[in-house]
């Protein structure tokens, strides 16, 4: 909005030329997101408390979690507001990738909102069924996949980090692959969101990493020099990534241990889906497995736990996702959280190193 309002006036007022610079708009999207969190956060938390939108704590989990009973949830509304508003203010709204990403943010946010609303406000403990959530997730992600598949100029090749000459053409299989990336990322972040600040920290780190890759992918000279796929217009996604970083840090102010609010499904499903679609649009889908390694480990721990119990009658972990396993082993919650953040930072550095290791 500000880009379209002020940049056309740059011919009369030279200082407004600054709006054409992606770095400037990305930084201010980040700052704006932080401000939105700090201004709206306390108000939204009070409203959630007034609605009795309080987290239901599992009785079969770690005993320390019983202290969290009564903490308001659905705080993802703070995050989504802090991402959407700065994006609308600072991004180039003629860019189709911006609208595809906003489509996933809002769409997956609505799925999570309905699930949270039914569970914590309407006191329907089941919320949306797993099938209902999966149906809508696949439908929205599939819609994005089909749109990209039929869009001229967007290739269906799969680019693999560390291998500059290996990029198989997925053809029609591009559609289910994209759907899997978006849905998988969404649910992996959702599974990770079990401790105070555990999910939002890695989400912010992932967003910062993709902010760099989006900028490079959209830059003709840098993408050619670093030999990563050039995606015309993808650089604008750095603005959304910047807003995600700012929103993540702003929400962490309230969500850090001991949390004043939880993000709920409205936040986790939407944030995961957003990371997935950005990975697809920047042609860095495989990179998400590296930088989002914590999310992958959390998801795999659940899959292995369920599979082992179903076919062997034995559990691999004391409890899944794996962060609960460490809790039951006696590791303090803050230590688990910070260690997972450290691992994510290391994985982000490995992911960034792929820019040169090709």
From Swiss-Prot:
**GO molecular function term, any single one:** phospho-N-acetylmuramoyl-pentapeptide-transferase activity
- Identify the GO cellular component terms for this protein: plasma membrane
Which co-factors does it depend on? Mg(2+)
EC number(s) stated in the UniProt entry for this protein: 2.7.8.13
- Which GO biological process annotations does it have? cell division; cell wall organization; peptidoglycan biosynthetic process; regulation of cell shape
Q: In which pathway does it act?
A: Cell wall biogenesis; peptidoglycan biosynthesis
| Catalytic reaction equation(s) | UDP-N-acetyl-alpha-D-muramoyl-L-alanyl-gamma-D-glutamyl-meso-2,6-diaminopimeloyl-D-alanyl-D-alanine + di-trans,octa-cis-undecaprenyl phosphate = di-trans,octa-cis-undecaprenyl diphospho-N-acetyl-alpha-D-muramoyl-L-alanyl-D-glutamyl-meso-2,6-diaminopimeloyl-D-alanyl-D-alanine + UMP
What keywords sit in the KW lines? Cell cycle, Cell division, Cell inner membrane, Cell membrane, Cell shape, Cell wall biogenesis/degradation, Magnesium, Membrane, Metal-binding, Peptidoglycan synthesis, Transferase, Transmembrane, Transmembrane helix
Q: What is its main location?
A: membrane
Top-level EC class as recorded in UniProt: transferase
UniProt topology in membrane: Multi-pass membrane protein
Q: What does this protein do?
A: Catalyzes the initial step of the lipid cycle reactions in the biosynthesis of the cell wall peptidoglycan: transfers peptidoglycan precursor phospho-MurNAc-pentapeptide from UDP-MurNAc-pentapeptide onto the lipid carrier undecaprenyl phosphate, yielding undecaprenyl-pyrophosphoryl-MurNAc-pentapeptide, known as lipid I.
Q: Which family does it belong to?
A: Belongs to the glycosyltransferase 4 family. MraY subfamily.
Q: Which PANTHER family match?
A: PHOSPHO-N-ACETYLMURAMOYL-PENTAPEPTIDE-TRANSFERASE, PHOSPHO-N-ACETYLMURAMOYL-PENTAPEPTIDE-TRANSFERASE HOMOLOG
Name assigned to this protein: Phospho-N-acetylmuramoyl-pentapeptide-transferase
Q: Which organism is it from?
A: Trichlorobacter lovleyi (strain ATCC BAA-1151 / DSM 17278 / SZ) (Geobacter lovleyi)
Gene from which this protein is expressed: mraY
